[in-house]
Swiss-Prot record:
Residues 110-201, 240-468 form a coiled coil. This is Golgin subfamily A member 8H. GO terms for biological process: Golgi organization. It comes from the Eukaryota. It comes from Homo sapiens (Human). The keyword Coiled coil applies.
Length: 632
């Protein structure tokens, strides 16, 4: 826009200049005009070019001829006019120059104004763009505010409805509160009446409970002395068990020594066989060399054939002996490897048995620590009967299985001992025959028969099973003792915290004692507790007899048992001990005075009806005479 205006102004100024020149320019010759256009600042040249000097004109005129004075005057007058015009033209030119300068200054000012206007327009455009962006953001914010306003209106409506519902619920709750307060006041009044009625009865009941707790304390002291005696008995049994384990360990060590000696003898035999093989190889090489030698030039016909046949037979015999010896060596090496594997397995078993012995020593040392324990009689009678039943079942299984296994293993061992000697071949036959004629060794080497080897491994598996079962029995006994001790601690804590615990609605597991009046129920519960303690004292005596009979039978083997072999003497002896233990346990069970007690009969009857009980170390509590039952 500014450039267009500037061009328009320049065009207008040019037009004005042209008009001005046209108006003020006189009619002059073309030469003068041309000189004025080319150089307007020198008027003298124009005048000199436009009119000739007077001398020239005079000479010209003189050339042409004489002129009159009138013509000279006429010529002087236009020259003067032209000089005046030129002076006026120079003044006009200076004025025009001034106007041009002023116009240039105006042009610069206009250009400066145009630049400022451009900058202002750019700023306005930038501001316009910023305003457009702000307008867009304001429109977006306006839309968001409209949506928020809509949601706020909806939430206000929802909260208004909810407040109305809550007001209704509050009214209902206030009504319910008033009803509950009225009911509570009625209940408090009835409770106060009952408390006033029962205050007189509670005093007599507390006095009776104190007397009962004193009696129970005296009974528990008696029971504590009995438990101390039984603890001493357990310590003696522990010492005997430790001595027995030491003897077993010495036997196993002796067996290991014997096996090591047998391994040494087998190695010597192997070395001798290797020497024999080397000798046979040397003889074979000699025979081959003899056969490879050339025959004499003129041998007799018949002796050469006989000699060849003899050499062939000798070669076949030596080759057969060599093959047999190689097979024998391979078999001996296999036997040695298997024997070493068996020795390693037995060492591992010995190590495990030593670890078990150490664990048993630790458990016995823990039991040896003095502890103040009390007993809950009827529950522990049940536990003892279940434990005896488990011991009987385990020992019956052990007795039946291991007596059969022992008889079979005795037969197999005798057969193995008879098959121990290997028949000799060739030059080494005398040595092997002499070894076969020796007496059977106490720890036989591994037999050649695979069936006998399998029997030997099955026998060792039976021994492992027997050891595991005996360990299971010991673990059951330890669980029984720990459970017994924990229950005693719980009972003493209960008696101390709540003296003379309630025996209301108490009865035994069988349900023989039923609930009557309050005083009668408590008396019956106290009587049942006394019967239970007496029965438990009788059970302690019977249990001591049971343990003594078990140890006596463990020291003496049964008359019908087979003679123990050197390989499994201790294991078979243990089997017989377990059988005698079951028989003694059965005898004690027949003579146990618990069966005559009315409190123990339902327990025994329940155990006979449900023989599966007792497989778990957690014993169900069936004696309710000592436990408080708060039904009301």
């Amino acid at each position: 826009m500014a450039e267009e205006t500037q061009h328009n102004k320049l065009a207008a100024a040019k037009k004005k200049l042209k008009e001005y020149w046209q108006k003020n320019s006189p009619r002059v010759p073309a030469g003068a005009n041309r000189n004025r256009k080319t150089n307007g600042s020198v008027p003298e040249k124009a005048t000199s070019g436009g009119c000739q000097p007077p001398g020239d004109s005079a000479t010209g005129f003189h050339r042409e001829g004489p002129t009159s004075s009138a013509t000279l005057k006429d010529l002087e007058s236009p020259c003067q006019e032209r000089a005046v015009v030129l002076d006026s033209r120079s003044v006009e030119i200076s004025q025009l120059k001034n106007t041009i300068k002023s116009l240039k200054q105006q042009k610069k000012q206009v250009e400066h104004q145009l630049e400022e206007e451009k900058k202002a327009n750019n700023k306005k455009q930038k501001a316009k763009r910023v305003l457009e962006v702000q307008i867009q953001t304001l429109n977006i914010q306006k839309g968001k505010l409209n949506t928020d306003l809509y949601h706020m209106k909806r939430s206000l409506r929802y909260f208004e409805e909810k407040s109305k519902d809550l007001a209704v619920c509050l009214q209902h709750s206030l009504q319910r509160k008033g009803e509950l307060e009225s009911v509570l006041s009625n209940v408090m009044a009835t409770q106060k009446k009952k408390a006033n009625q029962l205050s007189s009865r509670s005093k007599a009941r507390t006095e009776w409970k104190l007397e009962q707790s004193m009696r129970e304390e005296a009974l528990l002291k008696v029971q504590l002395t009995q438990l101390k005696e039984s603890f001493q008995q357990v310590q003696l049994e522990r010492d005997e068990c430790a001595e027995h384990l030491k003897g077993e360990r010495a036997r196993w060590q002796q067996r290991m020594r014997k096996m090591s000696q047998e391994i040494c003898t087998l190695k010597k035999e192997k070395q001798q066989d290797m020497r024999r093989v080397e000798k046979l190889e040397r003889s074979l090489s000699k025979l081959k060399n003899q056969m490879a030698e050339p025959l004499p030039p003129e041998p007799p016909a018949v002796p050469s054939e006989v000699e060849l046949q003899h050499l062939r037979k000798e070669l076949e015999r030596v080759a057969g002996e060599l093959q047999a010896q190689v097979k024998k060596n391979q078999r001996i090496s296999l036997l040695n490897q298997r024997q070493e594997e068996r020795i390693q397995e037995q060492e591992e078993r010995l190590r495990k048995q030593e670890e078990r012995i150490q664990e048993q020593h630790k458990s016995l040392q823990q039991l040896a620590k003095p502890q103040s324990v009390f007993e809950e009689p009827n529950n522990e009678n049940k536990n003892a009967l279940q434990l005896e039943q488990q011991v009987k079942e385990l020992q019956e299984k052990l007795g039946e299985e291991h007596l059969e296994a022992a008889s079979q293993q005795n037969q197999q061992l005798t057969a193995q001992l008879s098959l121990m000697a290997l028949p000799g071949e060739g030059h080494g036959g005398e040595h092997l025959d002499s070894e076969g004629e020796e007496a059977p060794r106490p720890m036989p080497s591994v037999p050649e028969d695979p069936e006998s080897r399998e029997a030997m491994s099955s026998f060792m598996d039976h021994l492992e099973e027997k050891a595991d079962l005996s360990e299971l029995v010991k673990k059951k006994e330890l669980c029984f003792i720990h459970h017994w001790r924990d229950r005693c601690h719980q009972k003493t804590h209960h008696l101390l915290s709540e003296p003379g615990g309630r025996a209301k609605d108490a009865a035994l597991g069988g349900g023989h004692h039923q609930a009557g009046a309050q005083g009668g129920d408590e008396g019956e519960a106290a009587g049942a507790a006394a019967d239970g303690i007496a029965a438990y004292s009788n059970y302690n005596n019977g249990h001591r007899k049971f343990l003594a009979a078990a140890h006596n039978s463990a020291d003496e083997p049964g008359p019908g048992a087979p003679a123990p072999q050197e390989l499994g003497a201790a294991d078979k002896h243990g089997d017989l001990c377990e059988v005698s233990l079951t028989s003694s346990a059965q005898g004690e069970a027949r003579e146990d005075p618990l069966l005559d007690k009315p409190t123990a009969q339902p327990i025994v009857q329940d155990h006979q009806e449900h023989p599966g009980l007792g497989s778990n170390c957690c014993v169900p509590l069936l004696c309710w005479a000592w436990l408080p039952r708060r039904r009301r």
